[in-house]
Curated annotation (Swiss-Prot):
It comes from Drosophila melanogaster. This is Protein CLP1 homolog. ATP binds at E16, K57, D119, V120, G121, K122, S123, T124. It comes from the Eukaryota. One of its GO terms (cellular component) is mRNA cleavage factor complex.
Length: 423
């Protein structure tokens, strides 16, 4: 059968079709011919065609059996009956039990964290649990603490969104009105003190917001985390669990982490060890870098289905209020009386524009002055420095919004860089 005509795949109950696309410009079309199937918790509509492009790693699961029609060039494609989906749906059922109790007693719904090393399917499990919750009428919050590969905002930030409808099969959840906090590094190790401060602030604001809507209050929060699970990374997980008051922690594919958490979290917290899916693929450093770049590119330019058209404009150095969070470390003996070396980690420091600023992504803070709580203030969006002209004392910014910058705009430096070679 030719690649253009495609092929029908018959899946038995509790099995899934997995495929990967690695070749650029390749696209794969999938449609559900009969039966019932879902992609990471989102039900497929019968006879509707779904399109997947380069980088897609897809697992279409069926509880009752189905026939799928697939056409296009795939690097890997196979059916597997070895899937952890039944365990994942059991986790949803347990969370749903907590939600029903919370609804009856007007309490907070379950706060569940998904933890594990890199490349075990943490964000996928979050997506499955959120989709299942929405499908039974819940409105949970999704908090993403993974600053390396964020699924809500661009890397270098932590973010929360309200989930009101299932994720789009091809594009994921709608990113409407996210609450985003600037961190500015690709790993919590970039500034551990700042990372904990930002996570604490987002947890505080998010938990307060649950009170404004009864349905969301009982629906609870699903939290995605970084893949750094040893040493300081483990300490960050404990910090997040405490800040959010997590009642359940789902540990993917690592017994050591599971046992450490059993030992260290309060007695009432349910710690559950889960297998990772056999379809999870390890990503190289290069692939991670590409994924970060792609997220930033999509922030400014959208995608083929919904393209954006960003603006480029000049800002004079004198009009640029640019700051960085975290000053170079000093020994305690050199610090002012009453200050510790770690206080420097959260200090807001002015940045003088130089050619080194080129390609850096900057966050636009809602804070209007450095006297405000800059760390504890969320950001409105991002821009990117595409040019630095020392002669004319000006920078060129790529921005989703036209000129000028808002009055009193306070920009925050990030180590993230984006080469804008979009044509």
């Amino acid at each position: 059968m030719s690649e253009d005509q495609g092929k029908d795949y018959t899946l038995e109950s509790d099995s899934e079709l997995r495929f990967e696309i690695e070749q650029k410009d390749a696209k794969v079309l999938v449609s559900l011919v009969s039966g019932f199937a879902e992609l990471f918790g989102t039900e497929l509509v019968k006879k509707k065609q779904y399109e997947f492009g380069v980088g897609a790693k897809v697992a279409i699961f069926t509880y009752q059996g189905c026939v799928l029609h697939v056409s296009g060039k795939m690097d890997v494609c196979y059916i597997s009956k070895e899937t952890p989906m039944v365990q994942y749906v059991n986790c949803h059922a347990a969370l749903e039990q907590f939600r029903m109790e919370a609804e009856e007693k007007d309490r907070y719904g379950p706060v569940a964290m998904v933890v594990g090393p890199m490349d075990v399917g943490k964000s996928t499990l979050c997506r499955i649990l959120l989709n299942y919750a929405v499908r039974v009428g819940r409105r949970p919050l999704y908090a993403d603490l993974d600053v390396g590969q964020g699924s809500i905002a661009i890397s270098g930030s932590v973010a929360t969104i309200l989930i009101e409808r299932p994720a789009n099969v091809e594009e994921g959840f709608a990113k409407t009105a996210p609450l985003v906090y600037h961190f500015g590094h690709k790993s919590p190790s970039g500034n551990s003190v700042l990372y904990n401060a930002v996570v604490s602030k987002m947890a505080e604001v998010t938990l307060q917001s649950l009170n404004s809507n009864k349905r969301t209050k009982s629906s609870g929060i699903i939290i995605n985390t970084c893949g750094w699970v040893k040493g300081s990374g483990y300490a960050h997980l404990l910090h997040a669990a405490k800040a959010y008051g997590a009642c359940a922690i789902f540990v993917l594919d690592q017994e050591r982490l599971y046992n450490e958490l059993l030992r260290d979290v309060p007695k009432g917290v349910h710690v559950v060890l889960l297998p990772k899916s056999g379809g999870v693929v390890e990503r190289s450093k290069e692939l991670r870098h590409e994924a970060r770049d792609q997220r930033i590119k999509e922030y400014f330019y959208g995608n083929t289905r919904a393209p954006f058209y960003p603006f480029s404009f000049e800002v004079k150095f004198q009009d640029l209020r640019l700051y960085k969070i975290g000053a170079p470390p000093l020994p305690d003996s050199c610090m002012p009386i009453g200050m510790k070396a770690e206080d420097n980690k959260t200090k807001v420091v002015a940045v003088t524009p130089t050619p080194a600023l080129i390609h850096h992504v900057l966050a636009l803070s809602f804070a209007e002055s450095v006297e405000d709580d800059v760390i504890g203030t969320n950001v409105a969006g991002f821009c990117c420095v595409t040019e630095v002209d020392m002669e004319r004392q000006a920078v060129m910014l790529l921005s989703p919004q036209p000129r000028p910058l808002p009055p009193n705009a306070l920009l925050l430096w990030s180590e993230l860089q984006f080469m804008d070679n979009h044509t």
